[in-house]
């Protein structure tokens, strides 16, 4: 099996509401795939199911050929391999930027303080924040907080990075610095599954774009193909609305 990630007929309900209705797709190493769709279409739920923050009701998810949805799956090992960057940063307010990054390295990977610090500083430098290593989250802008979140995920050396609307909580002028880091990661070959409506990033960096609606993948394809020649009316209307909301500049 050559796929890094394979999602096979995944269903998820919350009470009587079925949020994921038989989602299936695959990703190869180095792919940067983006999930788009209206609010409530299941995008974030799909991400959370991949690293077991949310449990699926049925179906299977494979990472590197291994079924990671079985009861005996080592969830901590899964989360070492699948990093996640959250919409609201999820940083510990009482820890510095550096310590937010080293925490997982020490607690999960069991590294000593010096090893963890070396890796953390390398990743903070990678996202342009080494100078802020001793700053606390309250002293950082939203864009800086999100870049710390990315550094924290990268420090675990994951096979796959999940991004759940990483720019939606940011002031508009701070979006660019986060998108730039994501674009750099894409160009370096990081495998990424992203929920985002940042169309500039989608057009320039995405391998494929998946359009979700009502818990299903309506259409999948290269961004250029979907923007220029969508097969489904639902795709066309959604993307037209998205372009209008973002000023039509893509």
Where on the chain are the PLM-derived regions?
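ABC family nucleotide-binding domain
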Residues: 3-5, 11-214, 218-223
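C-terminal boundary and immediately downstream tail of ABC-type ATPase nucleotide-binding domains
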Residues: 224-250
